[in-house]
Amino acid sequence: PLNTEVTAVLLGSNVGNLVDQLAEYGADKVIVVDDPELETYRTEPYAHALAEVINKYKPEIMLVGATAIGRDLGPTVSARVATGLTADCTLLEIGDFPLVAIPGKEQKHNQLLMTRPAFGGNTIATIACPDNRPQMATVRAGVMQKAEPKPGAKAEVIEFNPGFTPNNKYVEIMDVVKKVAETVNIMDAKILVSGGRGVGSKENFKILEDLAEALDGTVACSRAVTDNGWLPVDRQVGQTGKTVRPQVYFAIGISGAIQHVAGMEE
C-alpha cells in the first residue's frame, strides 16, 4: 500500500454540488476547477486545466476513466506533462519494477504496474513508468468494483484557477446532437447468457435470447461474435469488451480464451 491520500479532480462549470459525492466515494481532497470555459467538453481547455493541476500538485499517480472523453483527455495531458500513459488498463497493482530483480539494474519499489491487452488483444502486457511522474493510466469501466459510499463523509476542497486564455486550439461548439440508441448495459446484469463462435450463426442466438428471457437475464458474447457482426459491441465481454460481475454466467460455444476470461473471472 502507498499510504497516501486520494485526491479527485473535478472539472466543469457549476459543478461544486458534486464535491460531497466524491467525498462519500473516498476522496480525501477534491481539487475543483469551476469555470464557464469548461461548460461543454473541449479538448484544449480541459487538457490545459488538468495539466496545470498536475504541474502544481505533482501527483505520483493520475488515473482517468477510459471513457470517450478520457481517451481523448488522458493522452493529451500526458504529452503536455512529459510522461507516459497506459491506456485501457484492465488491472492496476503496486509492486516492484523490473518485476524480477536483474543484476546490475536498480529495482524500484512502489511502482504502478499497469496491465492491458496488446497486439489486438492477442497478448497481455504489464507496463510501468519508473522514470517519469505522474504515472498515468486510463482505466476501463467495470474493472474496479464500485465502493459503497460513506454518507456524510467530507473532503478538503481546493479551489484552483489555471487561467484560461482562448487560442486557436479552442474549438467552438455550434450544436450538440444526441442520438438515442437502444443499448444494453451488461455490466449490471445479475445473470448473463453469453455466446461465442460455437453458437454457429446470428440466427442461433435466438435460442440464447429465449433462455435469457426465461431466466430474467441478459445476452452477452465473445469478441468472435461481434467481429462476425452477430451482436453489437456493447454486448462483448473480455479485455477488448466489458468487464462483468454477474452472479451466474452461462458460457455457450465459448472456448475460454484468456482475453475473454479476464472480462468475467470475478
Q: What is each residue range found by the language model?
A:
Residues 1-266:
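N-terminal glycine-rich FAD/FM-binding segment characteristic of electron-transfer flavoproteins
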